[in-house]
Amino acid sequence: MRQRTPFARPGLLASAALALVLGPLAASAQEQVAPPKDPAAALEDHKTRTDNRYEPSLDNLAQQDVAAPGAPEGVSALSDAQYNEANKIYFERCAGCHGVLRKGATGKALTPDLTRDLGFDYLQSFITYGSPAGMPNWGTSGELSAEQVDLMANYLLLDPAAPPEFGMKEMRESWKVHVAPEDRPTQQENDWDLENLFSVTLRDAGQIALIDGATYEIKSVLDTGYAVHISRLSASGRYLFVIGRDGKVNMIDLWMKEPTTVAEIKIGSEARSIETSKMEGWEDKYAIAGAYWPPQYVIMDGETLEPKKIQSTRGMTYDEQEYHPEPRVAAILASHYRPEFIVNVKETGKILLVDYTDLDNLKTTEISAERFLHDGGLDGSHRYFITAANARNKLVVIDTKEGKLVAIEDTGGQTPHPGRGANFVHPTFGPVWATSHMGDDSVALIGTDPEGHPDNAWKILDSFPALGGGSLFIKTHPNSQYLYVDATLNPEAEISGSVAVFDIKAMTGDGSDPEFKTLPIAEWAGITEGQPRVVQGEFNKDGTEVWFSVWNGKDQESALVVVDDKTLELKHVIKDERLVTPTGKFNVYNTMTDTY
């Protein structure tokens, strides 16, 4: 285990086209700013920035028109058109760090009481040059024109516009049941192998593709919300739930002769997460979805998506005990041990265990964890929930059987982004769960077996380098001896187009770094235009093949590449004009059973 070299690249991920991941990355809440002495000094001070980069995360709020507020004395007024342009830029590029209401998140607050003291010239310089502490150099990188920089400096001197709330009235107005439960099949009407079906996000098309895991045939393409973030399965495997970044939920009945959306609802303006009840006796009973804006979650009927209970997540931060107006809902999982949903609340640093047995008398266990909670998954026993507080480089462990915090561990890396993580049995350490990192090239292993390996439980046991920084997902399967790590957001095309593969059986645990094999996935896809990025390995049901998305621009060719897990050789390339910006892939069986 050695100290890793941070991963840094000015201007990386500035484009909203790369907004795949959930939530902000910049750790600039601790940034101390001072007005630059002169332009040359400012350029020198701000020419680079840290690996904790901003990631656009509120791209749908950017589409809402709002009226420009009045300007106070000494501040230039903006027309409605100018204000809406600035609002669009802010929500696409700034709100993920600085908050919807500009009250700060991982980035500093930008409310007028603060920005007016700094003044137009300072704001203009800071937006132009950025800072080493995480603020992107929007001007010198070319992401914003000089005119847009001036516009944004002026915009920050005005009062922020609050997006509309989204309550029961709005949800019920959006709620549609296309096929009533009594009109649906009583048994599977198609001959699809549903357990080996893949739901593939076609991000910029606002669709998903359903692909046969054996024949690689695209069985169907269905319209959904914009930029589907995840697909989740009901406990029975019958219903597929998908949620778009625009807050739209589609419920798809896979038993129908032609699987189709049987119910839909919109739960907010920005959203990322959905899950269904899995506790024995409660299978398929409820679904839950969480929103970024408004900050809330809603519990819905599992057969119709009828909204039953909306709960706001606004409240006090766990550490400073200060009120936060917009703590976003990040990952949601269903407990296998209790009739509870596990809800990550990002900015307050709280994990909520929501008991769904009595919605009229809702009981919630609130666990103080760590701020900026993002994604995570269950260990191999399904008892323990391990989640990343990415801006604080921590892993949090929750015992879902006892409903208690178990541990908080620093990963030793920068900005962990595990997806749902990877469970495997290490030759030396026993059962472990792994995460890769966005901010550096490291992979960290935490012990997960308090009974069989108590000395290793809930400790970071090893850290070793993979291909490079910018990883989004790490993956293995119980039937595989390999661990796959992508580097999707790395600026180097050769790295972002490849994956690292580690032989688990060859891991020694003696402090030496395990070797890895590089698979040139993008090269295998035969795509020559753009800079296709390889993202998220997903296994088939049996763990004999692993699929990767080769993600390119909306108007460029993309593909899916299938790798033979035994030989690590190319097995198949899926290309089709309907595969527009494929990103996340979700095998029905693995998703239904939390196999990862």
From Swiss-Prot:
Location(s), subcellular: Periplasm
UniProt keywords (A-Z) are: Electron transport, Heme, Iron, Metal-binding, Oxidoreductase, Periplasm, Signal, Transport
Binding-site residues for heme d1, renumbered to this chain: Y54, S57, W138, R203, H229, R232, R245, R272, Y292, R420, Q536, T583
Q: Where is this region: D1-heme domain?
A: 163-596
According to the record's subunit comment, the protein's assembly and interactions are: Homodimer.
**Name listed for the protein in its UniProt record:** Nitrite reductase
One GO MF term attached to the UniProt entry: heme binding
Which GO CC annotations does the UniProt entry carry? periplasmic space
Q: What is its EC number?
A: 1.7.2.1, 1.7.99.1
Which species is this record about?
Answer: Paracoccus pantotrophus (Thiosphaera pantotropha)
As its record notes, the protein acts as a catalyst of: nitric oxide + Fe(III)-[cytochrome c] + H2O = Fe(II)-[cytochrome c] + nitrite + 2 H(+); A + NH4(+) + H2O = hydroxylamine + AH2 + H(+)
SUPFAM superfamilies named among the record's database cross-references = C-terminal (heme d1) domain of cytochrome cd1-nitrite reductase (SSF51004), Cytochrome c (SSF46626)
The answer to keyword Metal-binding applying to this record is: yes
The record's remark on the cofactor is: Binds 1 heme c group covalently per subunit.
